[in-house]
Swiss-Prot record:
Annotated Gene Ontology cellular component terms: cytoplasm
Compartments (UniProt record): Cytoplasm
GO molecular function: metalloendopeptidase activity; RNA endonuclease activity; zinc ion binding
Protein name, as recorded: Endoribonuclease YbeY
Required co-factors: Zn(2+)
E.C. numbers: 3.1.-.-
Length: 156
């Protein structure tokens, strides 16, 4: 299983070991979700101010959040599907707030590693079409998150 992950660290605080952890968690998720080899995702680490700007500009919520996902496969109104015979599948972009991840790890009483793995996985599942807008969808998404985290060894 080979997922291509492009990391961008705007905070200059993210250690290589954290990127390796995220790579391993997302590889496990891709395997469990039967995502084809060569699919691509980008992961950008930002501070609270930057994620607040993105949240405001794209989601009309003027506050910082922990993770934002931009799925490349979601069709917008009036967009045409572009089919590339030999192009790898681009799943989308994940944007993770490092300060928020640290705050939440402390708040929930678990490690920063676990929180970072959780946030990356949560965003990744959104890229795959999972959501939690309804109670039924939430149950499905959170159940799948739990399965993958436990299979990886990051369960609670």
């Amino acid at each position: 299983m080979s997922l291509l992950i492009d990391f961008i660290d705007e905070t200059e605080e993210v250690k290589e070991e954290y990127m390796s952890l995220i790579r391993e968690v997302l590889e496990k998720a891709a395997q469990m979700e039967s995502i084809e080899d060569g699919a691509e995702v980008s992961v950008t680490f930002v501070d609270n101010e930057r994620i607040r700007e993105i949240n405001r500009d794209y989601r009309d919520k003027d506050q910082p959040t922990d993770v934002i996902s931009f799925a490349m496969e979601e069709m917008g109104e009036g967009e045409m599907e572009i089919v590339g015979a030999e192009m790898p599948r681009m799943l989308g972009d994940l944007i993770i707030s490092i300060p928020r991840a640290k705050e939440q790890a402390e708040e929930y009483g678990h490690s920063f590693d676990r929180e970072l793995g959780f946030l990356a996985l949560h965003g990744f599942l959104h890229l795959l079409g999972y959501d939690h807008m309804t109670e039924e969808d939430e149950k499905e998404m959170f159940g799948r998150q739990k399965e993958i985290l436990e299979a990886f060894g990051l369960g609670r």
